[in-house]
Amino acid sequence: MLSSPFRHSLCGVCWAIAALVMGGWLAGGVPQATAQEPLDPTKQVRDSADQLKIGGKDWGQWLGSPYRNNVVVAEKIPLEWDVTTGKNVRWSVKLGSETYGNPVVANGKVYVGTNNGAGYVPRFPNNVDLGALICFDAESGNFLWQHCNEKLPTGRVHDWPDQGICSVPMIDGDRLWYVSSRGEVVCLDSEGFLDDENDGPFTGEPNGNKDEADVVWKLDMMKELKVSQHNMCSCSVTCAGELLFVITSNGVDEGHVNLPADASPSFLCMDRNSGKVLWTDSSPGANVLHGQWSSPAYGVLGGVEQAIFGGGDGWLYSFSARGKDGKAELLWKFDCNPKKSRYALRGATRNHVVGTPVIYDGLVYVAVGEDPEHLEGEGHLWCIDPTKRGDVSPTLVFNAADPNKPIAPKRLQACVETEGDFERDNTNSAAVWHYGGEDIEENELAMHRAVGSVAIKNNLLFIADQSGVFHCLDAKTGKPHWAYHMESESWASPLIVNDLVYIGDSDGEIAIFRCSAEMEKLSEVYMESACFTSPIVANDTLYIANRNRLYALQEGAQAKVEEEDGESPR
């Protein structure tokens, strides 16, 4: 966490000067922004929802759609609320003791991943550690059912204690898909056993209790694909029709040096109805740096269906969504790190992709990051043209032994000058612009590593980095407009609702800004404990999960205040 005792903000004029110093650049030959009306990203979300059997104002997957742009239009969304008095709170409910899974809302239900600290299921009291996916009624907040994932016997190398479910489910009709803490891709019946049916083909649940989940099918990636996730299996899936896209979380061993399963898949495409694996890819291979905890995006770009995955090697990969002849078909790949950057357990300058790639107006946006426990570090945010093919990185690495042939990627450092390596500009580069790099100005406002993703509206891009700096840039050029220091780490992705931007931090504060090229902070609300998740809006209700509680917020609401064990109002 940064030790700065003050909050920073810089005007657009200062940032325009600082951009060159901080590493911002715009690739030559790329069409510049015009005076035409900016894309309406909320229409993309609505169009995506129209393809699913969910309500038109539901929020049925991570970041709302396969485009992964957390932008929405809504009414009655408050600027202020008070979780201690219940002002503008419709309801709140207990979660586990640690919550890293984001809430989603579909067809009258709210789903959120956490641990078992709330103890909703009698056969697993709250002193039993589980990965828990919990389903609540969206209107009342009443508990409906929980999918209970017992801890893996291998322990923290695969299933870190108390972390619970870190992924976010996707819902379509009466089906739900998510990645469990046990390394399983799971399809559930969204009704659970409340419909008095045990949906199959899987019918081996331990019981048919109405407070537990009804599993339709599941794929054990550790058993069937020999995947070895590092610490936690975390991927928030997305779909294109009947295709389900998954990142496996395959990573290093407990010593953080070796990869136990470097030939196992990193990326999957599955039939979401049957659980059949349609194609796999293991491109990151032995070059995975740590874990693989990003989530896929999907879009039709340049007339081609593309499934886009952030790799644990720091590369972004795009594949033909449907594959070819039962195999993965790579369209392009992009190294998101400078070639001379180096990976180390502490103080690395090379990073992998943790946040989710975002698609906006035909371009792809992604930032690099790292497990927050591995300290802070410099970051890089990229805008990429997805219509090019092959290796579309900004530069290529060669070696003096064969100076005309690019060398293969290397794990810890791509370009080692002492070994005769050198760089050349890539004439096939798809980089539109880059933002970040070393903090030469030493004002702590450079782009740091990021766990979250960007949100974009009206060509204004917002992203919070792990060090707690909230950045606003021009989405077309990468020009910085302003930055604000939140004085606390942030793992969250911003939410843009109407002309407001919401972002949370690990101190438990939600800051609200005007969606503007001029920095205007409107409000800051304390949530009583850390907010590692991202705010969402569904059906004119703002949902925020802090470390141990889920809140449904709406202008004019008043939750009943109860004094039970010091709990917040509900």
Each predicted region: which residue ranges?
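Bacterial N-terminal signal peptides
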Residues: 12-28
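N-terminal secretory signal peptides that target proteins for export/translocation
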Residues: 1-11
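Noncatalytic, solvent-exposed loop/strand surfaces
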Residues: 32-570
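Intrinsic low-complexity/disordered segments
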Residues: 5, 28-29, 33
